[in-house]
C-alpha cells in the first residue's frame, strides 16, 4: 500500500472542502445594486401637471448628480434623509398618471416598472445603468457613472 494515494485523496478532499466553504461565504449580489451609485441627470423627459420649477430651472439641473447610498441620498449637494430603498412593481402608465398627473409616453419606461423610494423622491428603473428620476415636478433620464477600477 502506497502512502501517496492517501495523501492525494486528502489533498483533493481538502481542496473540495475549501472551495465549498468559499462558495458558501462568497458575497451575494446586493439586491439594491441596480439603484446604488452616482447618477448624472442627462435629459429632461417631461413634467407633471404641477411643478415647482420653471422649464428653464428644470433644464439647468441636467448634468447635476444624484448620489444613492444605502444610508443616504444626495441630490446636487443637498442631502435627503436616509432612504428606505423600498421598491414596488407598478403599472407604469397608471402609477405616473395617478401619482404625478403626468403621461408615461415620453419617459421610456417598461409597462411594469420598479419604483424605488429614495425618501425625497422616487426613481424608476428603466434599463441597465439607466433610471428615471422625478424631481420637483420634472422627470429626468439619469445614467450611472462608471465605478473606478481598483
Which role fits each region the language model picked out?
Residues 26-40:
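N-terminal helix-cap/turn-to-beta initiation motif at the start of protein domains
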Residues 121-143:
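Short, exposed beta-strand-loop hairpins at the edges of beta-sheets
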Residues 33, 60, 67, 125-126:
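Residue-level signal for WD-repeat beta-propeller blades
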Residues 27, 148-150:
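Short, solvent-exposed mixed-charge patches
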Residues 38-75:
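Short, solvent-exposed loop/hinge segments that bridge or flank secondary-structure elements
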Residues 17-25:
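C-terminal segment of classical bacterial N-terminal signal peptides
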Residues 1-12:
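Bacterial N-terminal signal peptides that target proteins for export
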Residues 45-47, 68-123:
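Contiguous, well-ordered beta-strand patches that form the walls/edges
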